[in-house]
């Protein structure tokens, strides 16, 4: 029986069940290029479906990668009818929350007690903006919003959402949120069970059912936790380069993901030289680096023999703009052949 795993992402690109795809790894290894490439290939392979690519990295790069401006609202990629992008902007989201709090304060008759004046100055946004993990929390809220929209038939509907995540530490905090919130809400539930009437009276004229709101939030968080741990719905694609530190961090990331019960079976290895196949450009430095890369590639192949390990070439130019991304991303669907495809890495269009 042949247990060989294909060295490409063909099965994921053509998947009809996945709703959430996370792309992550160490900083500077090509996560954004990889997430854009996965999103493009899925959109090209399944033209009847809609895909959304979300950047949860504070150093948003989607706009730079595609060469067009994206913001906090999803917008179609020029030249692709079924792929949209958005960049979650924590500062803009916090300002929106601040404005909402001002409106609520005025509605509840608190406009004259100074609270509205404080909030008008952006105090809530300033305070919450300094809380560690706020970026991850806002990204999580975006996931909750999309699930709610899908269930209620509201807003734009997307068959699959691809996440261009922040470097490893931020991503792990984001993925911990469902479990953390679930435990936190359980504790809150115990408190509200004992102090419910008093808490509801403190809610004021708004007559907010705090216990009901907490239960609703807990149900939504549990739905996300269940979806994130369902391998048919969610998977994580690790991105690395063939160097010691990147390999070490990838292993740590994979072990953490396994502890969260998340599916992870794909690794993209970027920036490979394939020096012995390129006699025309094979300098001593290239030979030395390729020798080092092969050493760690051998370790990757040994450690992750049951993973889809996709080996991507180092291109001569920048992989920016839709046309260049299409050329590069094709090697996710059908693995790069350094002999047959060697010329492609020198044929990228220059971008200003």
Swiss-Prot record:
Enzyme type, top EC level: hydrolase
Major subcellular location class: cytoplasm
EC number(s) on file: 3.6.-.-
Gene Ontology molecular functions: ATP binding; ATP hydrolysis activity; guanyl-nucleotide exchange factor activity; identical protein binding; metal ion binding; protein folding chaperone; unfolded protein binding
UniProt binding sites for Zn(2+): 283, 286
Cellular location(s): Cytoplasm; Endoplasmic reticulum; Golgi apparatus
BP term (GO), one: post-translational protein targeting to endoplasmic reticulum membrane
Ligand binding (ATP): 26-33, 243, 270
NCBIfam families named in the record: GET3_arsA_TRC40 (TIGR00345)
Purpose: ATPase required for the post-translational delivery of tail-anchored (TA) proteins to the endoplasmic reticulum. Recognizes and selectively binds the transmembrane domain of TA proteins in the cytosol. This complex then targets to the endoplasmic reticulum by membrane-bound receptors GET1 and GET2, where the tail-anchored protein is released for insertion. This process is regulated by ATP binding and hydrolysis. ATP binding drives the homodimer towards the closed dimer state, facilitating recognition of newly synthesized TA membrane proteins. ATP hydrolysis is required for insertion.
Subunit comment: Homodimer. Component of the Golgi to ER traffic (GET) complex, which is composed of GET1, GET2 and GET3. Within the complex, GET1 and GET2 form a heterotetramer which is stabilized by phosphatidylinositol binding and which binds to the GET3 homodimer. Interacts with the chloride channel protein GEF1.
Name of this protein: ATPase GET3
Organism for this UniProt entry: Vanderwaltozyma polyspora (strain ATCC 22028 / DSM 70294 / BCRC 21397 / CBS 2163 / NBRC 10782 / NRRL Y-8283 / UCD 57-17) (Kluyveromyces polysporus)
